[in-house]
Amino acid sequence: MESRTLRLGAGSAGETSRRAGLLPTRGPVEIVRIPTVCRMCGQDTGCGAIALVRDGRLLGLEGMKEAPHNRGSLCARAHAAPEWLYSPQRLKSALVRQGGRRGAPWVPIPWREALDLLAERLLDEKKRYGAESLAVLSPARRSYCGYMMRLLMAHGSPNYGHSGICYVQRSMPFTYTLGGHRPPVADYAQADLMLLWGRSPTCASAPMGGLRALTEARRRGMRVVVIKPTQGGEGRFSDEWLALRPGTDAALALSMLHVVIGEELYDRDFVRDWCFGFEELAEHVRQYTPQWAEGITGVPAGRIREVARRYASTPRAAIDLGNGIEHAPGCSDAARAVAMLIALTGHLERPGGNLWPPRFSMPALKNIELKERITEELASRLVAPEMPLGLQPWELGLASSYKGILDSILTEKPYPIRTLIAAGTQPLASGRGAKTTRAALEKVGFFVVVDVMETAEMEYADLVVPVATFLECEHSLVSWGPWLMAPTRAVGPLGDYGSDTDFWVQLGCRLGYPGLFWNGDVERSFDEQLEPTGLTMAELRKHPFGVSGAVLPRTYERYGEFFGAVGPRLDRSPYLPRGKVALYNEAFEAAGLSPLPEWREVPEGVTATPDLAERFPLILSDHHGSVMYNSSWLRNVPSLRRMAPEPELEIHPETARSCGVADGDRVEVRSPHGTMEVRARVTEDIRRDTVMILHGFWQGCEELGLPGYSLFDGGANPNNLYPLGEHARDPAVTANSSQTLVTVRRIE
């Protein structure tokens, strides 16, 4: 790549180093300013930050203005980084059970010895049972996932299970409907109307631009429709709120398609030139009237028509689709139907609509996941395919269902998993069915926890391997659009451990694949990823604030490019074989799924199980959006815990009165499957027939004397209350239902 395409973070290398405090300056230096990237949200790439360090100790983080996405903004989580880094719950040494007996006391061992022990076991099990006896659970899209996938491919196991609670569940159906490699994003800068559908930009990645974009768009007059059971922080930005019942997004989207097609509000030229299966879809959605959807969603038919018409008739309108749609057995069809709404109304790849990313002069990094090793035979050994085999591998490579892996441990079908590694994930806190998950962790032959902090799952583990925080990593590489950065280690390791990357690279070498793992040299692994850019890590480090390529001039309507996108499918065919929007989806049909989006009832609901609803009259669901926490962690951080010290059940004032509950009361929430005991928060920002809770409370906070919570009955874990089974899962992406019916009563 020509150097003229690069834009340094700020001036010359020496100049930026002095600004960063990395070069000597005259006089004593009390505080060293070190460019880094904040990963307190757990994102694959995070916000640019400056670590403030004195005498080797982190004092805090401040925003890095040179970072193109957060532009100097940081959230409460970033400001709590020192408390998290120095938490008494940090894991600082590898731990193994005394005498190898599960439940026996923990014994500290050297980190390298822990890797030796694990490698020895995996090699023995590969010889005796096959490589597929290893399964790894991990969140999707983490910085180490490429290394984790590389190890599985090198070892010969297809069994990667991502958490099934975010991103993939909507992204895969979009890919097979619209092409591209990820969903097109809402154009906040030019939209006149925004549908926030299951999305919370006020707390989800807010510093990375969502909240800023929403605020700026509202100032220039953009109208906002919020579509979800609660308004949350988006209420102050919204002009209208469609408060649908949890898990009914597919019904709403299908009825909006009914209006758009039935009233001929679609873009005729686009449909003629770029859509396949319009006649079949038009006939199919005739059954999904707004009156029908009203009975399921609880949204009046007139309002459904009004919003559908407004969206279709506004030239610059976009849909910002979020995690909220991903927790129902109809998740994939909800995503497909929303993708079709974007396309049919002429809002795809047009100003103010939904856009694919611009082009950059900075080439993408090289993939290191060894996807070339994926074969039909390897795919056939998936213990519990995340998607039908006809739709795999997808962008993330081969994947098993997170919950399916745990279930297979219990059933031993189609074969038993012998060793399970939980890498940066908490299956008890994050996955559905805490009781069955506990049974699986108790049964599996060998269970390994890899994390920076103590977890609830450690109680069932045989081996615990600590890893470094982002502040302690010697080797790190960040890519965000055209921006590349090699963050500098802010503080030395606080214990005996390496980074997540070190863990997978060193384990790969110990398993006998040193050539595939750069002979243990992590620096070389980053150099390989950087090859397309013409840079090396040594060169990148000369620019502590990173380097940026140019954003090329935006062009629109790039349909041929994205409709022809080819993923890692074994036959190398494009996601859209006809090069057009798949309204009638032949790939889904070939995989045994419905070629057209359809409605699937939630397993337990007002219309799905009316008899059950007579005994359990309220709908329970949960949400992940929080300005202080991230999923199931950070409750042990004092400054964050002060902001939300207890788990709270959101309940409407009228519903609370009918239950004899006042704001702040302790309440029992009971479903047919389990119970919670939490505090009530009375709010008008929720449907009357629905109660909602923030997912993820289990940690205590020693410094504040605040308790932890059980993940089972009587605790604060909504996953303990949901139904399980095939009827609660999406057939295309195995999204799990997070809806059930409950009673709420005041605890005296």
Language-model features: where?
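Extended redox/cofactor-interaction regions of prokaryotic respiratory oxidoreductases
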Residues: 146-215, 220-227, 234, 250-254, ...
